[in-house]
Amino acid sequence: MPYLDRNGVRLAYSAEGTGPAILLSHGFGLTRRMWQGQVEHLKDRYRVITWDFRGHGESDYPSDPDLYSMEQSIADMTALMDHLDVDKAIVGGLSLGGYTSLSFYAAHPERCAARLIIDCGP
């Protein structure tokens, strides 16, 4: 399992396939593995990137509450894209992942080829 080190916090991720990038973020209490069915169907045409938020799945669980915020999540997504040499991606997610993807778009519209927002509240 590959990890990205973000100032001492390890973030688990996977990147499968080739083609335009899709960055998918999971819902609260879930993990990147929730996307496995979609990854299997998309990886022949896309580079599908999934990741575990801080405090989820195989990523680290920092004890400092200041290390959890929307700004941190946006910075984590940006760092992951940079780490994987992805300039622009279809950015999407479910629930918390959808809300975070919208926030990422608001902060970095130039890095979003499109948005895929699923079951996300206002």
Protein language model features and the residues they cover:
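Alpha/beta-hydrolase fold catalytic core
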Residues: 1-22, 44-47, 86-87
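Serine-hydrolase catalytic-loop signature spanning alpha/beta hydrolases and amidase-signature enzymes
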Residues: 27-37, 48
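Active-site glycine-rich loops that stabilize anionic/oxyanionic intermediates
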Residues: 19, 27-30, 95
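Alpha/beta-hydrolase active-site loop signature
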Residues: 29, 53-57, 122
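Active-site loop/oxyanion-hole signature of alpha/beta-hydrolase fold enzymes
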Residues: 40-43, 49-92
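Short N-terminal helix/helix-N-cap motif within the alpha/beta-hydrolase-1
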Residues: 32-36, 58-61, 99
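Conserved hydrolase catalytic core segment
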Residues: 87-122
